[in-house]
Curated annotation (Swiss-Prot):
The lineage of its organism: Bacteria, Pseudomonadati, Pseudomonadota, Gammaproteobacteria, Enterobacterales. Its main location: membrane. Residues 192-276, 279-361 form the RCK C-terminal domain. It is a multi-pass membrane protein. The keyword Signal does not apply. Keywords: Cell membrane, Membrane, Repeat, Transmembrane, Transmembrane helix, Transport. One of its GO terms (molecular function) is monoatomic cation transmembrane transporter activity. PANTHER family: K(+)_H(+) ANTIPORTER SUBUNIT KHTT (PTHR30445), TRANSPORT PROTEIN YIDE-RELATED (PTHR30445:SF3). Belongs to the AAE transporter (TC 2.A.81) family. YidE subfamily. The chain crosses the membrane at residues 4-24, 26-46, 65-85, 96-116, 117-137, 158-178, 371-391, 393-413, 439-459, 464-484, 493-513, 530-550. InterPro entries: AAE_transporter, RCK_C, RCK_C_sf, Transpt_YidE_put, YidE_YbjL. This is Putative transport protein Spro_0050. One of its GO terms (cellular component) is plasma membrane. SUPFAM superfamilies: TrkA C-terminal domain-like (SSF116726).
Amino acid sequence: MSEIALTVSMLALVAVLGLWMGNWKIYGVGLGIGGVLFGGIIVGHFAQSWQLNLNGDMLHFIQEFGLILFVYTIGIQVGPGFFSSLRVSGLRLNGFAILLVLVGGLVAAVVHKLFAVPLPIILGVFSGAVTNTPALGAGQQILTDLGSDPALVDRMGMGYAMAYPFGICGILLVMWLIRLFFRINIEQEAQAFASSLGNQRELLHTMNVAVRNPNLQGMAIKNVPLLNGEDIICSRLKRGDLLMVPAPLEKLELGDYLHLVGKRESLENARLVIGEEVDVSLSTRGTELQVVRAVVTNEKVLGSKIRDLNLKQKYDVVISRLNRSGVELVAGSNVTLQFGDILNLVGRPESIEAVAAIVGNAQQKLQQVQMLPVFIGIGLGVLLGSIPLFIPGFPAALRLGLAGGPLVAALILGRIGSIGKLYWFMPPSANLALRELGIVLFLAVVGLKSGGNFVDTLINGEGLAWIGYGALITAIPLFSVGVLARMVGKMNYLTLSGMLAGSMTDPPALAFANGLHPTSGAAALSYATVYPLAMFLRIMSPQLLAVLFWAM
């Protein structure tokens, strides 16, 4: 068998064995995707024992490309909500996440100096203790740039593997200890979160209002500021027994009924100006009007503002609301359309059909991946990651690297959504497939490289000490920040659990946190809020530690 064929076969064997091991559960907790690392260690151990020669250049390429795929797809997934997550409560949650990362880096630095642990080893232990694989890749890259011994750089994977198991279990233990320490009642926490969410979330509401203000008599709808802004949509008008779509030039009459869509405060302001709220049905049932949902899939309208489509004048159709990534928005005239937006259309059937054709409404396109933007994004990310950042006094330039560059590029492109006919929307199933493929390839190679000396290091070397260092790096930041967030920040326990899982970028911990209460979405919401920034900081922190301690 050729060297390349043997290398591919070994990678496939590692993936099969590792994914199988990852499915093992002990009290509901498993290694998950981390099982691939240990599958690689096992195969790597026997590969060295049997003197099998694998292609080093091929392994290096697969490792780096797998890492790029993983971080890029993460960025595309969370990009649309990343910047908005930094507002309001997101600032508070991300503040604790930043503190947790800083404390973890501080503990790693203290262990490095106190116990004279070699820099590559402590960076590997640090990455494993926080269960962050891209951090391992970033640490290996910066050490290579600094001129570290390649053999020592490869030993980072062993440090990672030693610390990883307690990294997975340690966060679950900390969640349990905090719950025990504060005597927390999960049901009460879920009810408190639901109550606070109801007060904070600005959902869209509807209101039927009768025109009673004589000043509006004979005034065209387009001339009524409240009905022509960005906060309220007037989707239906009823005059007598006639229900119609209100055209901009339609003149209001006293006694008209308007169906308004918007936020509660805006609707109350409109009611005060227009007249009074009435309990009158403006349903389209039994009329010539329909309400139909259509999804934006036509590249020609991507980036267009709703007003540019001129739907009211041309087709007598109004967009009553817009759903983007599960969030309902007021369909104001200045809203820019993005791929995958779901529009609520109100109008006659033939008109709605024409508008649906304009916006696309091709459901099958939501399951297709536009590959050109994927490689444009990866290319831009690699270029961005290669830009050196020179800081006075540092022995080497900092770079976002192959882990940080594609992540930042994907976050920005995911937020932009589309440029011309190019769109960065990726179906969840495709995103998950590419992400899992990337992390499996990366971990498989790391495991293969580490496996040759793993058993000897664990039994005869410093493996047990590395496990202890990893336990300190895992537990101290989690417990200290968790207690601080609960005592000082008065943070809801379910929200706290999700924040801890997101700060560690740890999906198994999120699964555990979600299982604390079957119906509350508190943990998932806080996890998603802190995950993007935490991932970015996790990638940068080993680079900063490497540069700071390289010359010391």
